[in-house]
Amino acid sequence: LTKFWMLNYVLNERPGIELTSFFNLVYAWNTGVSFSMFNDSGATGTLLLCLMAALIVAALLWWLYREKARAVQIGLGMIIGGALGNLVDRVRLGAVFDFLDFHLGVHHWPAFNVADSFICIGAAVIILHGLFYPEKKENKEQVK
């Protein structure tokens, strides 16, 4: 919804809006993956990225189905939601619409969107859960 709103109402073909000295809303299309890697892969690349994303989402859904830890479930939900949001863009529009642009002077972080943020935050939740709440392994040896 954020991409639709930004694309159709806020930016509406404008190249960008400067909000602060370090943050802009921009009009950017990403045909590649995170941070515009593989951006020039063409129609075949787009199809392969869609298939890969669908397979990853399927694997994450299986993990989510089997997962017991609530924090990991939340993290997986965020990743799945973000991935599906970007997949819908890629299937419908042939590219993912990015609009968040953070920068320091002339040095810009690659533009991204809210779905990308959900993917990164979800991954961080899972990593932090693994670091601070490691899975306890049951001792399967019988004590004699």
Stretch-by-stretch model annotation:
Residues L1-K144:
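Alpha-helical transmembrane bundles and membrane-interface segments of multipass inner-membrane proteins
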